[in-house]
A protein has these predicted regions:
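Glycine/proline-rich, positively charged
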Residues: 89-183, 187, 198
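Short, well-ordered coil/turn segments that N-cap beta-strands
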Residues: 11-16, 46-48, 72-76, 115-119, ...
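Conserved short secondary-structure transition element at the edge of the structured enzyme core
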Residues: 143, 235-293
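Active-site beta-loop-alpha junctions enriched in small/polar residues
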Residues: 21-23, 53-55, 81-85, 123-126, ...
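A short acidic, helix-capping loop that chelates divalent metal ions and anchors anionic groups
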Residues: 22-27, 85-92, 284
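Glycine-rich, positively charged active-site loop/lid region within alpha/beta enzyme cores that binds
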Residues: 90-93, 193-249, 269-273, 316-328
């Protein structure tokens, strides 16, 4: 497994990470046993950058990850997030970036993960009611006392990133980036590169759409949250599916999978970008790991660009309510 440094932070992570969200929620049924086996296999393969959050499964995902790494903590870089608040029944209750909440959330995450220190601690969504300087100030105190090693932001605007960086070094920005979500190329990527901040790309497989695994909406279970996403809607599904055909063709010519092409494309966008595809199954993890062996020629990249120009996907990447919480 290759390594990459997150910006100029000094934090070295595997070039490919593992998003753990779907092991607890959102993407249909999951098995804890299989999920833990997937995490263990990831570590064995050198995929040691693990990503979770306190809101995934209302804390259950952190507990799952903590259990999986209990006897191999020194082999992983552990990232979690705070700030997206949920009630005891899983209801979404907005965001909270107040200093008191920051510190309380960290304590709860440390307990659930059963660790003494979190390697990378992100603010999951920016709280528009609290100046980012106050939130990051509280986060920096967690670094001072040794509960957190590095700080990160998620789905923050360029202006917010700049303000945050003046308070404490930001190691990473985590934001969606893939062939069908390229908004960050306008302002976000140039900003983090200017400031020496690493970029962690979540949903690099377009929430699974770019894998070529879906042919109709019926392929999504009734409990799958993607049914509520505009790009998976009846209105947009067919046109988005047509975009994936070029990826299929390139993959077939190289004797690899569409997933591997999609991940290789993200990896090719810069050594400072680390994609964290999520999966709860060993076979998909292994498939994703092999994307690092895929080399895209200039011709391949040109074909991909022609098929997936900026803004090619139909529909917004989140439902309206969730879109309101990004890039602020």
């Amino acid at each position: 497994m290759q390594d990459r440094e997150l910006g100029n932070s000094g934090l070295i992570v595997s070039a490919l990470g593992l998003g753990c969200m779907g092991m607890s929620e959102f993407y249909g049924e999951a098995s804890d046993t299989e999920s833990i086996a997937t995490i263990h296999r990831a570590i064995d393969l050198g995929v040691t950058f693990l990503d979770t959050a306190d809101m995934y499964g209302v804390g259950a995902n952190e507990e799952l990850v903590g259990s999986a790494i209990a006897d191999r903590r020194d082999r992983v870089v552990l990232a979690t997030k705070f700030g997206s608040v949920r009630g005891p029944q899983g209801e979404f209750m907005g965001v909270d970036g107040t200093p008191a909440y920051v510190k309380a959330a960290c304590e709860r995450s440390l307990v659930r993960l059963d660790v003494e220190t979190i390697d990378l601690y992100y603010q999951h969504r920016v709280d528009p009611k609290v100046p980012i300087e106050e939130t990051v100030g509280a986060m920096s105190e967690l670094v001072t006392v040794g509960k957190v090693r590095y700080l990160g932001l998620s789905e923050a605007s360029a202006a917010t990133i700049r303000k945050a960086s003046e308070i404490h070094p930001i190691a990473a920005l985590q934001t969606e980036y893939s062939l069908w979500t390229r908004d960050v190329e306008d302002e976000i990527l140039p900003t983090v590169r200017e400031l020496g901040i690493g970029f962690v790309a979540y949903s690099p497989l377009g929430r699974g759409f770019l894998t070529g695994a879906f042919s109709t909406r019926a392929d999504l279970s009734e409990t799958d949250a993607r049914r509520n996403h505009p790009r998976f809607s009846d209105e947009h599904f067919a046109s988005n599916l047509a975009l994936v055909e070029t990826v299929r063709e390139i993959a077939k010519a190289k004797n690899v999978t569409p997933s591997q092409i999609a991940l290789a494309w993200v990896l090719s966008r810069g050594e400072d970008i680390v994609p964290i595809p999520g999966t709860k199954r060993v076979r998909y993890l292994e498939e994703n790991a092999h994307s690092l062996e895929v080399s895209l020629s200039e011709d391949d990249l040109a074909k991909i660009e022609a098929a997936f120009p900026y803004g090619a996907a139909a529909g917004t990447r989140y439902p309206e309510a969730s879109m309101a919480a990004v890039n602020r």
